[in-house]
Amino acid sequence: MSVLTRKTFIEGASAFALTFGRRMFAAPSGWIPPKKPNLVFGVLADTHLRISRDGGYDGRNWPDKYLVSALEYFRSQNVDAVVHCGNMADRGVIDEMRFHADAMRRVFKDDRSTDGRKVVKLFINGNHDVEGGGYGAGFRLEQIWPDPDERKKHLLSSDMAGNWLRIWGEPHEAVWHREVKGYHFFGCDWGRDETAFAEMIDANRGTCRLDEGTKPFFFITHDITHDAFNKFIGGCPNAFGLFGHWHQSAANWNTIHMLNETTPSIQCPALYPLFGDGKWLGGGDKYISKAPLEGKLQGGQWRQGLVVRLYDDLLVIERREFGEGGSLGLDWVMPLGKRDPHPFSNDELKKVIGEPQFRKGAKLEVVEEASASPCLRVRIPLADGNPDSRVYAYEVVVIGETGSKKLFKAVYAAGCNMGIGHEPNKGVTTLEIPKAELPPGESLTVAVRPLTSLGTSGRPIITDFKV
């Protein structure tokens, strides 16, 4: 098979080739696809709703309004199902999962959409759900219920089957299989044997025709799956994974993983509030520039989720921010049946992520700050000149006198983890460089180029500055 270029990737699927006269990799705001999808489902992970010190609901930092906002968006998109990749509860407390169920019932009354369709719950437990009683930031459960026997009564894990039935109104299964509109889903709780999970999928391969045609089936876990399971799933050509736990922002394209270079598995972003790129960088950001990324707080405090749409020949993933709202960028589009090379492999993604660009006439603002901690302050305008490629970070190069060593810096783009149009300070990014780090010379040249999360780059803007 010939190499899939950016042009053929965009134009290869008839449903998305040309719309309103514009060539597309994904749908811009307000764009309506020419065909109704076969299946639509929302995806959440790591909600981490939590109790307060008095055992009630702690809505100060983890308000359920963002969960409700996500679910309401799913409802507006006519989802057929909602996936949760685990960690609905923060400390494994029964009421924490009940908070989640209450929000679901407010939005999907009787588990139905506004048109009366059944909305299927595809939920698994994460580590906080099954063993969260031992976790706790700020306070521990021992401070609320000092007596171990009393404390146990409040934990999901004390009777997961009974608690799940009482909360969700359906039996709990640690490993399960569901069918939604002809598409198959398999789920596995945290801590369960992945061998048993593989055996369940394998037992359904023939009866469910999982390997026939190009229709994908989905396996849902809390953490990314491990070697033995990955070896098995690599033999299932239509498999597609969804997992949480890592708390990475979906603005980062490194959250698309390939298991054994054959099976796509998407890390689903957390819905509870995070700054920067979350806790688990996975090494992806370390290699997109010649310097480590700084300024993660500028990326914004985000709460995210996904919407997946299935067509006959395409799988499309929409990435949303639910704190302030908005899209995180162009959809991820996977033509079905293309495997050599796989369209979600890193090399192929680099061909379609594009190159972010500054607008024509964009200028840097460089100011020397003479304070107790003297520095060079560089203000970078938002690189939104290419609507088909969103900026994730900037690489800054400072050049001094001839023969001196160049200084390399890198910084997250302001609001890179927020919805488009919700970047703080109009997307202007500030980088402060300590004066002691600057190369020698009375005149410095400062060059800044925009980067994507995969390291592709646009044209730099350059300015000279006299120290």
Go through each PLM region and give its residues.
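N-terminal export signals
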Residues: 2-3, 7-28
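N-terminal active-site segment of His-dependent metallophosphoesterases
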Residues: 27-97
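Extended active-site neighborhood of metal-dependent phosphoesterases/phosphodiesterases
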Residues: 33, 93-206, 210, 234, ...
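Binuclear metal-dependent phosphoesterase catalytic core
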Residues: 253-357
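Conserved aromatic anchor
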Residues: 376-388
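Beta-strand-rich modules
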Residues: 438-454
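Extracellular fibronectin type III
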Residues: 455-467
